[in-house]
Amino acid sequence: MKKLITSLLFFGVTIVAYAQNSYSQKSSIQLVRNATLILQYAGHKILVDPMLSPKGAIESWAGIAKNPTVEIQMPMRQITDSVELVLVSHTHADHFDDAANNILSKSIKIINQPADKSFFNSKGFINAETLENKMKWDNLNIERVNGQHGSGKVLEMMGKTSGFILSAKGEPTVYIMGDAIWTDRIKENIRRIKPDIIIVNSGGAQIKGFENLPIIMDEKQTMNLVSSSGSAKVIAVHMDSLDHCRTTRLVLSAEAKKNNITKDKLVILRDTEIYNLGK
């Protein structure tokens, strides 16, 4: 009976996902796993930071377990079919892995940061475009902003990372922060952009030997972000999928409750969950 209930719950989530995706072109975000997202936005299907490997296919980063630590809970075709654009914040394996390299068409449109130009060229992607600052793609405005992937010596090890800001007529402005810690630059971006939606990587990832220097936002930094987010909805992802991420959904939820942050203000997505972005 327990197995039957589990199976029904799994297929129930999948059915809900398919049903919501069948709506006309209403804007939404679906969390696949970790920081991999499907955006239905301005009439386009956009894939963000695809890590498509099966559970345990990538090395451990904290000496705890191989990564990812959980399987993708939806069919691969549901993720990749009809994708028109791929946004890649940076090319660490938890944001663009060997599986994504092998599964995605080499002719798919990719937008990447300047630091990763040679990476996509070397992988044979013929429609990868390096975004320095701003661009127009079809009916979308896309802006790239820098993120800070840690501090001190850890930052030197982690390299460059980026966030993306999406806007289009009649659509909410979406700020995909990418892998970044809380900084004055992020705060200024929010003040300048005034986004309607902020997607934050809140897993509190740490590098072994530098546990006091998080490389993405943890629960405390996420609270700082929420307090500076104005009227934006904050959507938290990048949790419960990697062995070096110490901030779990439960930890973040408890911190939000302690700070009187409502579930309407801070949305903690679960794998396969869809959140409608429409104003």
Segments (PLM) and residue ranges:
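Active-site environment of divalent metal-dependent phosphoester hydrolases
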Residues: P54-K55, T91-F96, K117-F120, M135-K136, ...
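Metallo-beta-lactamase
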Residues: N21-K26, V32, N112-E171, E255-G278
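Active-site HxH/HxHxD metal-binding segment of metal-dependent hydrolases
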Residues: G56-A57, M74-W137, S151
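Zn-dependent metallo-beta-lactamase
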Residues: M1-G63, S228, K263
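Cap/insert and terminal regions of metallo-dependent hydrolase folds
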Residues: A115, I181-D271
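A mature extracytoplasmic/lumenal domain signature
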Residues: R33, Y41-G43, P50-L52, P114-D116, ...
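Pre-active-site segment of Zn-dependent metallo-hydrolases
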Residues: H44-L87, D98-A100, T183-R192
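Active-site neighborhood of phospho(di)ester-bond hydrolases with catalytic His/Asp-centered motifs
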Residues: V48-D49, S82-H92, I111-Q113, V174-A180, ...
